[in-house]
C-alpha cells in the first residue's frame, strides 16, 4: 500500500496530476478540494494516498491532508459507493460541509452531486450518521484568492477547457459543464478556480 508520496508537482490536468518522485512519475486522481490547494507546477508537495488495485489497473488517489484521505476511505466503505462517487462528493462539497449535511440529514446537499438521487442520498445519510459522529468540523483550510492578474487569451481558453473536462469527469453532462464554465464572468481565473466557481454555481 502506498500511503504517502513526497515529490515535485510535474503536471496538473484536472482531476489528474503527475507527481515526480526521484524521477518516477506517479499519476494520481484527486478531488477538486485537493486541487484547489495545490502549489504551482514545479513546486514540492506531499500527498496522502489511497491505492485501489483491480484486475486491469492500479489506481492511485491523492489528498492534500490525511483527514481528507481518511474521509475518502470512510466513503468507499459504504455500500454502492466507489472511488468515482466518493471523489464526486468530495469535489462538490468540502469535508466539513459533508459532515454537516450528514449531521443535519440534509438530502438536498447530496442530490446536487451527479450520480446521487434522492433515495441514494437518504441511504448514504443514514449509513454515514453513526460513522461520522467522531468527525469534528474545522474551519476551511483554503479560500479563493482574489485579484489575480490578467491571463493571456490562450491560457484563458486552456483553463476553460480544463475546467469543462474536469466537470465532465465528475459526472456532469458536457452541456451542463460547458454552460457552468461559460457563466463565469471573471475569465482571469486558473482552471482550478474556474472549477470551484462552476461547482458552486451548480450546487
Swiss-Prot record:
Span list, region Domain II: 65-143
GO molecular function, one term: four-way junction DNA binding
Any one annotated GO CC term: cytoplasm
Any single Pfam family the record assigns to this protein: HHH_5
Region annotation (Domain I) ranges: 1-64
Keywords on record: Cytoplasm, DNA damage, DNA recombination, DNA repair, DNA-binding
Disulphides: none
Cellular location(s): Cytoplasm
GO biological process: DNA recombination; DNA repair
Entries under InterPro entries matching the protein: DNA_helicase_Holl-junc_RuvA_I, Hlx-hairpin-Hlx_DNA-bd_motif, NA-bd_OB-fold, RuvA, RuvA_2-like, RuvA_C, RuvA_C_sf
Main location: cytoplasm
Region of interest called Flexible linker, as start-end residue ranges on this chain: 144-154
Database matches in Gene3D superfamilies: 5' to 3' exonuclease, C-terminal subdomain, DNA helicase RuvA subunit, C-terminal domain, Nucleic acid-binding proteins
Region (Domain III) residue spans: 155-203
SMART domains given in the database record: HhH1
Coiled-coil residues: none
Family designation: Belongs to the RuvA family.
Subunit and partners: Homotetramer. Forms an RuvA(8)-RuvB(12)-Holliday junction (HJ) complex. HJ DNA is sandwiched between 2 RuvA tetramers; dsDNA enters through RuvA and exits via RuvB. An RuvB hexamer assembles on each DNA strand where it exits the tetramer. Each RuvB hexamer is contacted by two RuvA subunits (via domain III) on 2 adjacent RuvB subunits; this complex drives branch migration. In the full resolvosome a probable DNA-RuvA(4)-RuvB(12)-RuvC(2) complex forms which resolves the HJ.
Summary of the function given for this chain in its UniProt record: The RuvA-RuvB-RuvC complex processes Holliday junction (HJ) DNA during genetic recombination and DNA repair, while the RuvA-RuvB complex plays an important role in the rescue of blocked DNA replication forks via replication fork reversal (RFR). RuvA specifically binds to HJ cruciform DNA, conferring on it an open structure. The RuvB hexamer acts as an ATP-dependent pump, pulling dsDNA into and through the RuvAB complex. HJ branch migration allows RuvC to scan DNA until it finds its consensus sequence, where it cleaves and resolves the cruciform DNA.
Domain remarks: Has three domains with a flexible linker between the domains II and III and assumes an 'L' shape. Domain III is highly mobile and contacts RuvB.
Descriptive protein name: Holliday junction branch migration complex subunit RuvA
Lineage, top ranks: Bacteria, Pseudomonadati, Pseudomonadota, Gammaproteobacteria, Pseudomonadales
Gene assigned in the entry: ruvA
Amino acid at each position: 500500500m502506498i500511503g504517502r508520496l513526497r515529490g515535485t508537482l510535474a503536471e496538473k490536468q484536472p482531476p489528474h496530476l503527475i507527481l515526480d518522485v526521484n524521477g518516477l512519475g506517479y499519476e494520481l486522481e484527486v478531488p477538486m478540494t485537493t486541487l484547489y490547494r495545490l502549489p504551482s507546477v514545479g513546486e514540492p508537495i506531499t500527498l496522502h494516498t489511497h491505492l485501489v488495485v483491480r484486475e486491469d489497473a492500479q489506481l492511485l488517489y491523492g489528498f492534500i491532508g490525511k483527514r481528507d484521505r481518511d474521509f475518502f476511505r470512510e466513503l468507499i466503505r459504504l455500500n454502492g459507493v466507489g472511488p468515482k462517487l466518493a471523489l464526486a462528493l468530495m469535489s462538490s462539497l468540502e469535508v466539513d460541509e459533508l459532515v454537516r449535511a450528514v449531521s443535519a440529514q440534509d438530502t438536498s446537499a447530496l442530490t446536487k452531486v451527479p450520480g446521487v438521487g434522492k433515495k441514494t442520498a437518504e441511504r448514504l445519510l443514514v449509513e454515514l450518521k453513526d460513522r461520522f459522529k467522531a468527525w469534528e468540523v474545522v474551519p476551511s483550510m483554503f479560500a479563493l484568492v482574489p485579484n489575480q492578474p490578467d491571463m493571456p487569451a490562450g491560457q484563458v481558453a486552456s483553463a476553460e477547457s480544463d475546467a469543462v473536462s474536469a466537470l465532465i469527469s465528475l459526472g456532469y453532462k458536457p452541456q451542463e459543464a460547458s454552460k457552468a464554465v461559460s457563466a463565469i464572468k471573471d475569465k482571469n481565473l486558473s482552471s482550478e478556480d474556474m472549477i470551484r466557481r462552476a461547482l458552486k454555481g451548480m450546487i
